[in-house]
Amino acid sequence: MSQEFDYIIIGAGSAGNVLATRLTEDADVSVLLLEAGGPDYRFDFRTQMPAALAFPLQGRRYNWAYETDPEPYMNNRRMECGRGKGLGGSSLINGMCYIRGNALDFDGWAKEPGLEDWSYLDCLPYFRKAETRDIGPNDYHGGDGPVSVTTPKAGNNPLFHAMVEAGVQAGYPRTEDLNGYQQEGFGPMDRTVTPEGRRAATGRGYLDQARGRPNLTIVTHALSDRILFSGKRAIGVSYLVGNGDNPVTAHARREVLVCSGAIASPQLLQRSGVGPAALLRDLDIPVVHDLPGVGANLQDHLELYLQYACKQPVSIYPATKWWNQPAIGAQWLFLGKGLGASNQFEAGGFIRTREAFEWPNIQFHFLPVAINYNGSKGVQEHGFQAHMGSMRSPSRGRIHLKSRDPRQHPSILFNYMSHEQDWQEFRDGIRLTREIMNQPALDPYRGRELSPGVNVQSDAELDEFIRNHAETAFHPSCSCKMGSDDMAVVDGQGRVHGMEGLRVVDASIMPLIITGNLNATTIMMAEKIADRIRGRQPLPRSTAKYYVAGDAPVRGKPVRA
């Protein structure tokens, strides 16, 4: 069986669904969208209810559930590396935090030769194009894009307000919009949730516009085995359907667009013969193109929680009890409101821990309950927690193919915490978080410190806690980086160096990880490259102002030292 299309997109995730939707706006263009997972079932509360965000990480229906190799600086732990599977990709299972990164992240990208048009003011129009913010558009936010963004509302949990106020009392700025003029500081956090209280994954936002188009073919349960080449030109894809072993071939008249994410995109390229030649030869894979950067430069965000008991019964601890969940579910299902309609990450912040950082190097997410991100080990009392993590670790990892079997997971190593800077940032971060939590705004609520615990104070004690308890924020990226140096995989339009008709468009092409969650930026990148693929003029540069700290101190005088 063989089919022919103008474009074949491999992976219906945050980037692939954007490309599929935008490319098929041109009626004379045909697109095949291949997704290894299944549909994004709208009746499955696990992926549709924002408060149920821990559920899709459990099991393998929606999660590839990768694991790292033993991480040498983390007590040789094999660490989780969850990635989304199904229409929507990781936007179907993520925490729904709508954070774009710092303006200076993109200005930093634009300093690289060939990436000059990735500055913040070049990217901002595409962030706006993708977004519909529920309180309306402005210079920073869109009003008619496919991604629904919900802002925190008056009357939400008092712990959110107390935690933001504590950050301000600790001497840090207040910001009304973490995606607006100033990211630095503490404030409300937007979320990718529809006005009806449903998860706003890219299957809902983008694909729902495009599903009925005759020029779009979507195949689920289609695991791409390898890209097919004629010389150095990509001409198609061989893929497996369901549990079958008989490959199906599809041909691409124009381009193959790899949108499989930071783990699977380099894995697919390597399996197809594009990657480090020595690795490919070891696996008896014919080398189509020796490209040493494929799978290198792997980056992620690591985070840990500081947990506190809550003296007042205002946390969402009761919602973790099964006997309260039917009422919460019914309110969400029928009214689109209540606890179920929020991811419960409604406040957060970004700070600089030292003057050496030009823009924030630590991110906070505040949660009005004390529980693990994956829903396990909930503290059996009212509590709250701060998720704290460093943003631009100097540690670099890699993805290596283990075999030619498309169903075998690759070897993944992030080399977490492999630099002294990592340890310094996490020690600073824990100590500064404790200072924030000790401010008067939290006096009515703050009970004892549950984790790490007051007995964990010295550098050595903190380091041991970090080694044992830090975990991924699920932000793998940069493993097929954009650029022009010897380790770059793609150019500024996602075109694979040395190849024709082949692009990578997803979080793997970020040259450096951004300051914040990745989903919004991945969508923006796909919007931007979609215009390039279609031969359209880029959107005009924004003229919006944005904050640069310059000589501003990292913090003012705290209320309580």
From Swiss-Prot:
Reactions mediated catalytically: choline + A = betaine aldehyde + AH2; betaine aldehyde + NAD(+) + H2O = glycine betaine + NADH + 2 H(+)
Keyword Nucleotidyltransferase: no
Pfam families, per the entry: GMC_oxred_C (PF05199), GMC_oxred_N (PF00732)
Function, as annotated: Involved in the biosynthesis of the osmoprotectant glycine betaine. Catalyzes the oxidation of choline to betaine aldehyde and betaine aldehyde to glycine betaine at the same rate.
Protein's recorded name: Oxygen-dependent choline dehydrogenase
Record PANTHER family: CHOLINE DEHYDROGENASE, MITOCHONDRIAL, GLUCOSE-METHANOL-CHOLINE GMC OXIDOREDUCTASE
Cross-referenced InterPro entries: BetA, FAD/NAD-bd_sf, GMC_OxRdtase, GMC_OxRdtase_N, GMC_OxRtase_C
Cofactor(s) listed in the protein's UniProt record: FAD
Active site annotation, chain numbering: H475 (proton acceptor)
CC per GO annotation: membrane
Classification lineage: Bacteria, Pseudomonadati, Pseudomonadota, Gammaproteobacteria, Pseudomonadales
Binding-site positions, FAD: 6-35
Name of the gene this protein is made from: betA
